Amino acid sequence: MANYTKTTIGKENRIELHEKLSLTDAEISLNELPAGANVPFVHSHKENEEIYGILSGNGKAIIDGEEISLSTGDWLKIAPAAKRQFFASDISGITYICIQVKENSLEHFTAEDAVIG
């Protein structure tokens, strides 16, 4: 049995990779909002922090009532309890990756966990 899982994804507005890659400790989704669209709900989490990377486009996030502008290349970490909602700009859509992991669960960073050779 291989020590990896590979998948190919199509063009969808939201793709969750936990099932496609058999993820055990992370949720990763690829998301695309067309111009003028938004995530239709405000949400927070019980234990999981979220890391967002803006792959293309422009928009904004409202986090605990604060409006944050987003554009290609921006990265954002949001604590579990923060209430959040995402919006594409009226002119262009926004494509982003969301990585969700349990807050404070990482015990070792790459250099400490790597086995060379």
Where are these regions (language model features)?
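Short strand-coil-strand connectors
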Residues: 24, 62-66
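Short, conserved beta-strand element in jelly-roll/cupin
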Residues: 32-33, 44-62
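A short, N-terminal "cap"/entry segment at the start of jelly-roll beta-barrel domains
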Residues: 1-26, 41, 107-117
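Short, charged/polar surface micro-motifs in flexible loops or helix N-caps
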Residues: 24, 34-38, 58, 102-105
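Short acidic-glycine-tyrosine-enriched beta hairpin
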Residues: 65-80
